[in-house]
């Protein structure tokens, strides 16, 4: 009855029975709100409703909102795993009234749910109200029957909520649960309020004022209600535990990590299991909502979360990537409530696994440096910020990960020195950046907009138009006139020229007046609506207020239209072949080709690429009309239109639909529906043909395809056909047998390479092709030291050579370095069995690696390998090893 899933359902069902519209959780990446890193409260999706910018058909709503607090102002990351109630990911249950009911009904509903639906004892509950909120205090007495001592008045900002310096605001009323006097802590407002005895389980916000300025506050005409209850907190209360990590959901996740690692969640290992369970939730949900690990913004916060969990997996002794193995347990627990987890399972799994594999490569080395530096310190000391920065810059250790490692040792980090090192790096990067060469700063366009207004775009309906010059910019300054030969920027009251945005590049063409001709090389969109036309005056003089003719390069525009429409078809085809986790991560639409970046954890196979291409071309061959509609953004998304997470959209958006309508869930839905402000073909057949020419990696979890359309695609395929015929003739075979012929030649080549390599190995051991420039075997203090520098030997064959060398000398040290064609050096060192108690091959190979410019090395005491980029320093490396042996 009291499982997390049942509690969530009970809450939503209760408010649905009481006239509330049940709405889905909004994404963790807030839509249309650049001020927030992540959705961190239930009211975020209703922010514009509360401020009056939007209106909904319903007046009452209820949600179970997924939230993340791990970046910026709301950052719980450092405390997660070490306290009973801190999480990076949590669920916020809420009920909302938009000018419908107010304090009395909000208080009644909350008390009714807690005491009748959840059956909490009344004597275990107490509430707080804002000090001057007599109405709320009296309503609590009337509805709950609580005595005055259990209705606590609080004067601090904790009981007064505001959206910002201005905007809706109002007093709060918080509901607390008393865990009993066996747990330390006092009621809210007391000296002991930070204890764990009294836990806030629900916050009711009475939005009744509008803050106009610091000094002025007025009543709202339609007061509203915003409430929030942490699901994990109420679950702990209803399940009779005092710690959120003891509820059923976390017991399942922690049990899964215990089973895989073989380490019980006891003693020093409790925090690690908790960190992994919590961070798995935030990582999985962020990836499902389109965030991928990167080195900036939201992606960097995700990477910090993931790497913190991976470091704790390392503490548990996990030898293989762990988090992806826990994903099935998470989906089993939360997949029904949040189907996006199921849809994105493969993307989440692969992203977790790849990130952990990458980080493991540097984790050991970074921890080695950290242990070495911290060994010089004692409890209470500070780690040098420069060392912390090196860990960040070289080994990928976020600052909070370094702080987390040092926490148990009682050592902190000199954060000021770290910040200075970070700023120094940024300044150096800025100094090396040459800039774009543009003289005009962005601020000038806001000045232009304030003076002449925005530009009306006519390009959806026409490629020719008349207009009036409203502003001229030359050499970074606003001017009244430009003359023949000058590079300039023209702004007009209206234009058919498309300004670069949404991945589609800007139009080019001609602007002409009675006394001038201006070549437009590019068009850009600035300052939320000012279209700027960049180019050169070919003849005459252009002046402010001149009437002009604007003519877009139609041939170029036609190619751009085809490539943009093809991008939409490829996006949908990618989703159908690879899965619904595919989302757009970037694009470039030019006349020559299109480029599309998308979320996917691994390379796309040739077979998958063919399916994607065939699907897109099927829609091209349908030759159906491409439709565009203007509609409300919420309506468009409810009809299935794809929107980009984090993209800011106006209240009214342009929806582009392509492909014959299909029956889906009783509704007819076009094959592709996207929110898009770009220019498109009139019919899908106008695209002509789509051909994917390449697929590659952009970054972790992001792939890229490039494609051609129309005549460019046909020309490319014709050239490919000619090339295949020429290669077939060269290999004296037919085009149909070309693949088999190439495979045969590759097999022959591999056979000859093996034979040649075997001969080379024999010659090396016989001393016929060494290039060490010194004696191959030297006696050092009675120890035989054999070394060889060889070329054209594969690194994997060095071990066999070293083994043979050990047999040849009987007792001693053998070292080989091979130099590849690109100049890199690979080294292997062997120590005969009789000397491994005195000499370790790993220590010896690291001497070679340091000189070769590498980092460390690995292996066993009798055989180890390493490498480095400076193969030309092989002789120096051997000299360093010889010097070490002479001193040993």
Curated annotation (Swiss-Prot):
CDD domains xref list: AlaRS_core
Pfam families: DHHA1, tRNA-synt_2c, tRNA_SAD
SUPFAM superfamilies named among the record's database cross-references: Class II aaRS and biotin synthetases, Putative anticodon-binding domain of alanyl-tRNA synthetase (AlaRS), ThrRS/AlaRS common domain, Translation proteins
SMART domains (UniProt xref): tRNA_SAD
Cellular component GO terms held in the UniProt record: cytosol
GO terms, biological process: alanyl-tRNA aminoacylation; negative regulation of DNA-templated transcription
Protein biosynthesis recorded as keyword: yes
Domain text: Consists of three domains; the N-terminal catalytic domain, the editing domain and the C-terminal C-Ala domain. The editing domain removes incorrectly charged amino acids, while the C-Ala domain, along with tRNA(Ala), serves as a bridge to cooperatively bring together the editing and aminoacylation centers thus stimulating deacylation of misacylated tRNAs.
Protein name: Alanine--tRNA ligase
Gene source species: Bartonella tribocorum (strain CIP 105476 / IBS 506)
